[in-house]
């Protein structure tokens, strides 16, 4: 079974993912880390319709530019995959 790795911007509103990696320079990686967006963190997309992407992680809402969100690779989570992982 393959792992579904996509860019954060590809998630639809209401979908969740686990951050897999960030492609970018030290500045971008540091800026995202300061907002709590690091590898292994779970994020949920709140808004993805033009303008910045709005996500939540650990109860905090974060706005991310569309270009930056394309550089964040996530593993998409679905209810079925979560159930399988728990059993």
Functional labels for PLM-detected ranges:
Residues 54-87:
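C-terminal structural segments of small proteins and small subunits
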Residues 5-8, 29, 61, 69-71:
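Generic secondary-structure boundary/loop-capping signal
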